[in-house]
């Protein structure tokens, strides 16, 4: 069967025309990028794991009433989703100080935040996705006030649910990003959770060891990216656990880096 028309290729996914009007096929790649694609590489099997993890989380979120673009997984690397008009705002939810927040404000990485922080970034690679305020979003018409209310409400609900989901498998949800899109029904639009939720867009730390089980292993040259992604999938019950499976130990990667 011939491949359907390609619509768009991003850093981590390729979008193809879907089989029915109003649908799109998301293909998950193994490509890894960091620092706005200044650093590039490959994580073997990443696309397969991200597809499964995102499917799992989106399905659970739909079960608690979060509207999403996800329809169904098609195969190991592809899923069928609703076509949405992407709102050009990346929403970052932070529970623990890490990454750019630590650098901007001089807060030690790993410091628990007294309250959850929601940040907004304008999606523009040429501008390095600058942080923006609600006033910018309203001024330039990127989203309406009602849409931003829905986005903030969903972001908090997703954070509450995912924090519990990961805590149950001894993983700390440090921070993560979400994207949203709008679908039109006649003259009325509604906001859906879109894109993906996977170790690519979440900071996930082991609660006991503080090992990083996410793309920071690639960003910071820690090694063990494949093992970390697989560990997330295993703990979520998405990969079979062999009887002789050892507890994840990334010590060898630290030794290879002379740490």
Swiss-Prot record:
Functional pathway: Purine metabolism; IMP biosynthesis via de novo pathway; 5-amino-1-(5-phospho-D-ribosyl)imidazole-4-carboxamide from 5-amino-1-(5-phospho-D-ribosyl)imidazole-4-carboxylate: step 1/2
Gene Ontology molecular-function annotations: ATP binding; phosphoribosylaminoimidazolesuccinocarboxamide synthase activity
Chemical reaction(s) catalysed: 5-amino-1-(5-phospho-D-ribosyl)imidazole-4-carboxylate + L-aspartate + ATP = (2S)-2-[5-amino-1-(5-phospho-beta-D-ribosyl)imidazole-4-carboxamido]succinate + ADP + phosphate + 2 H(+)
A GO CC annotation given for this chain: cytosol
Enzyme Commission code: 6.3.2.6
SUPFAM superfamilies linked to this entry: SAICAR synthase-like (SSF56104)
Source organism, top-level taxon: Bacteria
Keywords: ATP-binding, Ligase, Nucleotide-binding, Purine biosynthesis
Pfam families, A to Z: SAICAR_synt
Segment forming the signal sequence: none
NCBIfam families: purC
Entry similarity comment: Belongs to the SAICAR synthetase family.
Protein name: Phosphoribosylaminoimidazole-succinocarboxamide synthase
